[in-house]
A protein has these predicted regions:
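Acidic active-site catalytic centers that drive phospho-/nucleotidyl reactions
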Residues: 8-10, 49, 103, 122
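Conserved beta-strand segments of alpha/beta enzyme cores
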Residues: 39, 78-80, 133
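Short beta-strand segments at enzyme active-site cores
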Residues: 42-44, 119
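Active-site-proximal, substrate-binding regions of enzyme catalytic domains
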Residues: 45, 51-78
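Active-site neighborhoods of divalent-metal-dependent phosphate/nucleic-acid chemistry enzymes
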Residues: 76-121, 160-166
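Acidic, metal-binding active-site segment of PIN/NYN-like and related structure-specific nucleases
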Residues: 104-146
């Protein structure tokens, strides 16, 4: 991977949730690759949703300190800060593509970062939003970073561990 790749919250959640089976394995491998290549992009919205979901929606919710450690690790990624222009842009995308405001805010952040790929399970696999293509990393025939049309808790269960070169998702 050499370009930048935007990652939606659900992919990060699966990467940390050992109870998610095959989705955990795929998400973990993707996130580790993005860390290794330093090509991961997220937004403040994704970080906020991740923090809430780790504490409230995970199979075994984490406490605030464990959640803080995970979120802090992602601060090494490129982060799109959502502001007023982001909200206005998302409202335009919401109308144009008939998607939820929150999904439109993610798409707008991906566009703002100049990414061409948005990894998400929530949006339609293969859908183009201007220059940004959604790729569902859980669809059977996905090759990460492929720009062509895709064909197809407690701290023990939700955690990160450090390695010298990068973070490693458990």
């Amino acid at each position: 991977m050499s370009d930048k790749y935007f990652v939606d919250t659900n992919i990060l959640m699966y990467a940390h949730d050992r109870t998610a089976g095959a989705k955990h394995d795929r998400a973990k491998a993707l996130v580790e690759e993005l860390w290794r290549d330093r090509t991961g992009v997220i937004s403040t919205q994704v970080l906020q949703e991740l923090a809430v979901n780790l504490q409230r929606k995970a199979a075994k919710p984490l406490d605030a300190l464990a959640t803080r450690d995970i979120v802090a690790d992602y601060l090494t990624w490129q982060i799109v800060v959502n502001g007023g222009d982001s909200i206005l842009g998302a409202l335009e995308l919401e109308t144009r593509y008939q998607i939820s405001f929150w999904d439109a805010l993610v798409v707008h952040a991906a566009q703002s970062a100049g990414t061409q790929v948005l990894y998400s399970e929530d949006l339609s696999d293969g859908q183009l939003y201007g220059p940004v293509r959604v790729i569902n990393p859980f669809s059977n025939d996905v090759r990460w970073g492929d720009q062509s049309e895709p064909t197809g808790q407690n701290a023990d269960q939700l955690s990160l561990s450090d390695t010298p070169e990068r973070r490693k998702v458990c």
